[in-house]
């Protein structure tokens, strides 16, 4: 039988040459990318793919593979682009970390002479290099932009992005159009990184460089915390559905930005500085600004302060035709050594440099802190003009040439602004804040200092992770504060007695397990938020989340609070927090369930959690942590879903820092323990609910049953002989039989000799989730 083969093209963003002239034109055009793309599939954008294998996949000659005659060998995802990927669960493992298992970054950072680093960074700011000369003789503006763009990828929806891991070093971020020429900033920092080595990470150094840049230009920052450990490979992260730089297929309806995205176009940090899709409309741009900054956890005042504060320094670069700019770092030649955007416009350096295509300097003192941004913004009327590179920008009408040139002291320029700068004057809410900052420079300075600190530290998690002598003493609400332990902790004997009381309280195994899981599984390894510490499950908004079963939750918490009150009243200096009791209840239930399945296991428990108050909890800030879907509890909420159930399950597992085997064993265990949300029976493939058996895997892989779709989108397992319905399940259940790798894990736990291993592996993974936010244990 002849097989018809189809030639396909598989463009990869990491190897794509950037046409800067096209980028400028695409600011006002929509890009084209394949249909049907799903959230976790953005790395492989297949055009013209069919069910038949691709005949050829072409690569640039510079990347020839000796084993394939110069052609790239297709990966599984090229053949089956809709296949669920679980690669994200195994990213940045010890196998890719050159520092070794014993390396403790926090310990190394504590030995760092931070003042010496700051001194070296301060000297760097004015040490202009011929290979990349400093604007106005000062690298401050460049370093601020580098730090801002390192942190600015953060998004509240899933907590991903941000400065916390030094991801700007890797593709795709190192080659985003919005990060053009930040490769130069990192190269300027290399001698300092080389000098201090493992004592300071790239992630910390990039943020610190931004802080020192501000301080060196006369601005008083709010503080700095170290503690961002580097990773060694890029995240597999969904940045958008587009297949071209600056594409904007992420909108629907009346410009509704798709979640979880935080930027308006592929390859931008926030918004298009020329306005939406390059249209120079400051009012429309204000809408984009408000939405994107909100998605990075910033309110209107913080937004105005950040834009104006950042644009008090430095300049943009658009000296000439963007088509003369060469490829980004990931598309460069070997001899370029990771430096990109080499320009053929005149010298390509200094006054001839091209980055964004815009040519704007905002203030008369671009290397000194001032209120001149607001002074110029309100002093002049503005007319639309073009940069030398053809980009839309604004020039002050009838103004004198008062703005210094970055490299020629004999030259002056008229004041210029970006479309997005004018939004701060023309949007009514932004205008009110901007005018207040104009009239009250001290308020502006304080707001910018706080907003900058928040921008660069938002993804670091609780203050226990902050390191160094410059950590501010003030506790901020967005840090999700939890009281320090102020009492003697319970002993092993107390723990055993409390377990007995909990199990005798009338609460069932499913109730205790589901409550503990609901409390702990809010944790996000991305921005280190959530988790069981603080017992915020008893507070708004978590107590009212549908997935947490408010009625059952209230019952469980009521009984646990009674046990807590009784113990604390009679134990002298010892106290137990509700946060600890919630976890201990789940731990006791797991041990009982294992025993009921014929396996004795001791589940590790470490006290020391504390209870946060409602006043210490910003309800609006916690709202994004509410799951749209939670495959561990077989829950799909009413809000719009942007992932399939199995994709959402893997996504949540990655946020919980789980591996593929841990994901598998936890789902199988939680199903038989009856931890599904709202009493759902889907995936509860056992007749012994509450016993920690391997029944889920045994019955899922049982060939005497046949699965088929049901009318409501779930699935039914029917007996092959009688056609009777034996079980029901969801996509989050069936994926463990359908996905070859997950099935391989499931088979391990379905064997007749795996019962003890299953229980022990479940207990270990359970403890891991319960302790994800226990940063105090590693201190």
Curated annotation (Swiss-Prot):
Heme b binds at residue 311. There is a cross-link at residues 148-270 (Tryptophyl-tyrosyl-methioninium (Trp-Tyr) (with M-296)). There is a cross-link at residues 270-296 (Tryptophyl-tyrosyl-methioninium (Tyr-Met) (with W-148)). GO terms for biological process: cellular response to hydrogen peroxide; hydrogen peroxide catabolic process. The active site is at residue 149. Its EC number is 1.11.1.21. GO terms for molecular function: catalase activity; heme binding; metal ion binding. It catalyses: H2O2 + AH2 = A + 2 H2O; 2 H2O2 = O2 + 2 H2O. Its cofactor is heme b. The record marks 145 as: Transition state stabilizer. The keyword Membrane does not apply. Pfam families: peroxidase. Homodimer or homotetramer. This is Catalase-peroxidase.
